Amino acid sequence: MAAPVAHYSKWYRAGDFVFVSGQIGLRDGALVDGVEAQAREVLANVAEALAEAGGGYDDVVKCLVFMTDIGNFSLINSIYAEAFGEHRPARSAIGVAALPLGAEVEIEAIAFLPE
């Protein structure tokens, strides 16, 4: 997973909750090309952050999905559903004007991981 591009932690534990900072489609320090590839890389980065914290997708209780083109919702949703399987945490999907480094999708997550 790429290092954060600004002054923040990729994830932070507060009691029994782990907050995964917004992840974009960075691989080896570069943004992957295209919304589908970015969505897959974003979810891989989220999974890696969760694993570092001792958890996985099944521990996620809430996700925020940001996209620069709400017209990509169905595509991003299908990739998200592949990753999460039967687990359906609460989620918001938000259209935004821009994301860091020209990303097309960003996802942050909150997981419940009792210590």
Protein language model regions, located:
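Short, polar/acidic, helix-capping and beta-turn segments at strand->helix junctions
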Residues: 1-115
